[in-house]
From Swiss-Prot:
PPR repeats lie at residues 101-135, 136-170, 171-201, 203-237, 238-272, 273-307, 308-342, 343-377, 378-412, 413-447, 448-482, 483-517, 518-552, 553-587. Gene3D superfamilies: Tetratricopeptide repeat domain. Transmembrane segments: none annotated. Belongs to the PPR family. P subfamily. This is Pentatricopeptide repeat-containing protein At1g09900. InterPro entries: Pentatricopeptide_rpt, TPR-like_helical_dom_sf. PANTHER family: ATPASE EXPRESSION PROTEIN 3, OS02G0565400 PROTEIN. Pfam families: PPR_1, PPR_2. It comes from Arabidopsis thaliana. It comes from the Eukaryota. Keywords: Repeat.
């Protein structure tokens, strides 16, 4: 694109047009030059002409080096010309306000934005505008985006306000960034407010951003109103627009209404793509109409759209969730026969379902065939299998596949290790569990809270609370905050070991940390007290439990009744049992069981 401006003198000729960025982005060649209406007067001294040329070259080089390849700064030449009052042609002033000062300021702002100095950039922008400089919208848009990413939409909105009042003209990209920031922050009303006041026409991206936010918030009716406004402003929906609305309609109003929207989409000349069809297939499956979804899948090619692996995965998952795993296996075989390349997700859907159903042999067959079809199993492929072996107490097979997994270059994740640790602890192999836990960090897998809780609980149940407490200290050192499960395990273990006073100490530490004890924790303390023939303290603890807002359960009362009987107060125990039954606090069947043990 040839951007030339006719001027009456060379110093007025240097001009950058506001549309520079858009033309550059479109790939048009820009020729920014000046065209003079006549030759430069011979009366102008050669030195002055050279200085004038240097001003132009300097400005041009600053523009070039500043990277103004986007929506460029508008430079104007407001020179006062040459003064010839004395007839000697001296250069009186070149008040160049295609503004080197603006260029320098914008360069500095741009540099701040590039280095992530958002707050400093904001202050500099305010100072720029205060001194009359016109900001370039490219770094300002980047500033808006940066603050939006930090959730500081108010600061971002202030930048947009500064831009609008400075003489700069924000374009649709700037507004889209601001609207997107509001939508991501859940401030949809503010986004709509920006849409209403935009000084340029919104584009399809603007509307799609707002429609996505409204639909995700369950505001389908309002989204349809925005669609109407979009059409009124001659902004035509694209496939993304309709797919957003079809997905929301499937969720909120059902597939029947979504199909009407699909028809409208076609009537407007907008062709659905595979993503649109996948949304509909998913909606049909969620309504429990699997056979209809399969028919829809088979009809897609005749509608001009080939299903992809995601389409098949949706159907496959629905087949598995409804127990039709044999159909799922047939669908996988059909995919392979037709030349579709299944993804690792495809295989994992089937493996996961078969393992949950205890069909480990079939799951192994599928896992072993994956490499033949260009898919390497990942940790999500092995984890269900390991869990299945652990559930069936086949620890040898679980360890075998764990080793096979590693030998094939697939490294276990924390879910893998948690599965193995849980199984080892349940099997009483807590020392093995501790050994694995100690090796996790060296294997590049950081333990999480559930990892520690699993081993702490295993140690506590195995009567090794000393080691469990050491693990508690270790997890605290790693900034992992203990929870109710952590303390309940320790309190229970200490109580069972007869260390009830130490258990009570941990209980109060528990409370000081703001962790709310549950009935299991209270019951553990009461059981420890009753076993140490301190039923009176156990009764006090029951009262304390009620005062703390924790409702006793049948186990709480059973512990106390058995504690009274254990201390030779069978009569009092029976009286309490009858009273609890009469008040409906214990079932008659439970009371009879307790009475039978006395």
């Amino acid at each position: 694109m040839d951007l030339m401006v006719s001027t009456s003198s060379a110093q007025e000729g240097f001009c950058l047009i506001q549309q520079f960025h858009r033309e550059y982005k479109r790939g048009n060649k820009l020729d920014v030059s000046c065209r003079t209406s006549g030759s430069i007067s011979s009366k102008i001294p050669l030195g002055s002409r050279k200085r004038n040329r240097l001003v132009l070259v300097s400005a041009a080089s600053k523009v070039e080096s500043s990277g103004l390849n986007g929506r460029a700064q508008k430079f104007e030449t407001l020179s006062s010309g040459y003064s010839n009052s004395n007839g000697n042609g001296h250069y009186s002033s070149v008040n160049s306000s295609f503004a080197l000062e603006d260029v320098e300021s914008n360069n500095h702002l741009r540099q701040m934005v590039r280095t992530g100095e958002l707050e400093e950039g904001f202050k500099f922008l305010e100072n720029m505008v205060y001194h009359g400089n016109v900001p370039d919208i490219i770094p300002c848009t980047t500033l808006i985006r940066g603050f939006c990413r930090l959730g500081k939409t108010r600061k971002a909105a202030k930048i947009l306000e500064i831009l609008e009042g400075s003489g700069a003209v924000p374009d649709v990209i700037t507004y889209n960034v601001m609207i997107s920031g509001y939508c991501k922050a859940g401030e949809i009303n503010n986004a709509l407010s920006v849409l209403d006041r935009m000084s340029v026409s919104p584009d399809v991206v603007t509307y799609n951003t707002i429609l996505r936010s409204l639909c995700d918030s369950g505001k389908l009716k309002q989204a349809m109103e925005v669609l109407d406004r979009m059409l009124q402003r001659d902004c035509y929906p694209d496939v993304i627009t309709y797919t957003i609305l079809i997905e929301a309609t499937c969720r909120d109003s059902g597939v029947g209404h979504a199909m009407k929207l699909l028809d409208e989409m076609r009537d407007r000349g907008c062709t659905p793509d595979v993503v649109t069809y996948n949304v509909l297939v998913n909606g049909i499956c969620k309504e429990g109409r699997l056979d209809e979804a399969i028919k829809f899948l088979n009809d897609m090619p005749s509608s001009g759209c080939q299903p992809n692996v995601i389409t098949h995965n949706i159907i496959l998952r629905s087949m598995c969730s409804t127990g039709r795993w044999m159909d799922a296996e047939k669908l996988l075989a059909d995919m392979l026969r037709k030349g579709f390349s299944p993804s690792v997700v495809t295989f994992n859907i089937l493996i996961n379902f078969l393992c949950r159903k205890g069909l480990l042999g079939r799951a192994i067959d599928i896992l072993e065939k994956m490499p033949q079809h260009g898919c390497q199993p990942n940790s999500l492929s092995y984890n269900p299998l390991l869990h299945g072996f652990c559930k069936e107490k086949k620890m040898d097979r679980a360890i075998e596949y764990l080793e096979r997994m590693v030998s094939r270059g697939c490294y276990p994740d924390i879910v893998t290790y948690n599965t193995m640790l849980t199984a080892l602890c349940k099997d009483g192999k807590v020392e093995d569990a501790v050994e694995i836990l100690n090796q996790l960090s060296s294997k590049g897998c950081s333990p999480v809270l559930i990892t520690y809780n699993t081993v702490i609980d295993g140690l506590a149940k195995a009567g090794k609370t000393g080691k469990a407490i050491k693990l508690l200290d270790e997890m605290r050192a790693k900034d992992l905050k203990p929870d109710t499960i952590t303390y309940s395990s320790l309190v229970g273990g200490l109580s069972r070991e007869g260390k009830v006073d130490e258990a009570i100490k941990f209980f109060h530490e528990f409370e000081r940390m703001g962790i709310r004890p549950n009935a299991v924790t209270f019951n553990s303390i009461m059981l420890g007290l009753c076993k140490s023939r301190q039923t009176d303290r156990a009764i006090d603890f029951l009262v304390f439990m009620i005062n703390r807002g924790c409702k006793p359960n049948e186990t709480s009362y059973t512990i106390l009744i058995e504690g009274l009987a254990y201390e030779g107060m069978a009569k009092e125990a029976l009286e309490l049992l009858n009273e609890l039954c009469n008040k409906g606090l214990m079932k008659k069947s439970s009371a009879e069981q307790v009475a039978g043990k006395m």
